[in-house]
């Protein structure tokens, strides 16, 4: 007899507990879709709790929120790489939203640095946004052009916020979050991680 047992992820076990399979016995496909969606929600909730729990415990909540919101503001339309494993995603999130704010929290920046940095970010948005993934190909040239335009407008808005905000250290944190998003859409990042770039080409 084999002693090998398959280790079921915690999120999957929790989803099984929360969803009654008996209610979906006549719709296996529907059950799997709902279960998968619930797993994604649970994974994100747990990741959020870990990142913000550590941030709160270390007194970095404001810094974490600043970096995270800047990152999400640009990511909304420019998309970009996702980690393929939950553990990797959590570790990367801790590095980006807890460790990086800790390192950069006391480094001030002036508006000339802001302008230079965001000029670089805007160029990357023009060249590379939006960037898709294997699991989320961005199909349709018109759709991609719309996303690119919105990503560039979002970059300009964030530039204005960074220029107007009176706290020099906050300017730095906004730029850090924005640069993380630039890394996630850059073709070099895809190449280094051996991920496929321009996944939409497979469907068009």
UniProtKB/Swiss-Prot annotation:
Its EC number is 3.4.-.-. GO terms for biological process: proteolysis; quorum sensing. GO terms for cellular component: plasma membrane. Keywords: Cell membrane, Hydrolase, Membrane, Protease, Quorum sensing, Transmembrane, Transmembrane helix. Signal peptide: none annotated. It holds the Pfam family AgrB. It is a multi-pass membrane protein. The keyword Heme does not apply. The chain crosses the membrane at residues 40-60, 87-107, 111-131, 156-176. It is found in: Cell membrane. InterPro entries: AgrB. One of its GO terms (molecular function) is peptidase activity. Belongs to the AgrB family. HAMAP family: AgrB. May be involved in the proteolytic processing of a quorum sensing system signal molecule precursor. This is Putative AgrB-like protein.
